[in-house]
Amino acid sequence: MIGKLTGTLLEKNPPEVLVDCHGVGYEVQVSMSTFYNLPAVGERVSLLTQFIVREDAQLLYGFGTAQERQAFRELIKISGVGPRTALSILSGMGVADLAQAVSLQEAGRLVKVPGIGKKTAERLLLELKGKLGADVGVRAHAANDNQADILQALLALGYNDKEAAAALKALPADVGVSEGIKLALKSLSK
């Protein structure tokens, strides 16, 4: 299996890039978020990869972060979601948005991605629950580190993602952690 490629970026044609690794050019499919974070053609690039073998093709998918690759791996385990659809989901919303949609059970956000219908969105929510990493979902709700700490505290106190996110939205953006927790608990007790 090919787990990582490091080499010179030769071509960028979304969603595909060509990476030269010691004289061998690898065609790699990437999500749009990874594509937009790539360096200029001719510069060094490093991509984490997932190698997929099918009857008719051997395909290489590249990712800028370990979280994106892990989300891709979880997505392709789901019935009805192949590599192309998984890449489309990651291109359409990114890992943090996907984790947030899953934690808040928002099928409507997934349906906005081309190729995802209502039934597939519901299946994604069901099968991805708890698999994308709690920290990614928590950080997706929070605008800054203080808000992330407040949200983490509310979750630790037993509030669910929806309740904690709603309480967080009601807080001023510049609130401190201890004051934010007090205000959030007050709003949740109503």
Curated annotation (Swiss-Prot):
One of its GO terms (molecular function) is ATP binding. Its main location: cytoplasm. Residues 142-190 are annotated as: Domain III. Keywords: Cytoplasm, DNA damage, DNA recombination, DNA repair, DNA-binding. It comes from the Bacteria. GO terms for cellular component: cytoplasm; Holliday junction helicase complex; Holliday junction resolvase complex. It holds the Pfam family RuvA_N. GO terms for biological process: DNA recombination; DNA repair. Homotetramer. Forms an RuvA(8)-RuvB(12)-Holliday junction (HJ) complex. HJ DNA is sandwiched between 2 RuvA tetramers; dsDNA enters through RuvA and exits via RuvB. An RuvB hexamer assembles on each DNA strand where it exits the tetramer. Each RuvB hexamer is contacted by two RuvA subunits (via domain III) on 2 adjacent RuvB subunits; this complex drives branch migration. In the full resolvosome a probable DNA-RuvA(4)-RuvB(12)-RuvC(2) complex forms which resolves the HJ. Belongs to the RuvA family. HAMAP family: DNA_HJ_migration_RuvA. Has three domains with a flexible linker between the domains II and III and assumes an 'L' shape. Domain III is highly mobile and contacts RuvB. This is Holliday junction branch migration complex subunit RuvA. The gene is ruvA.
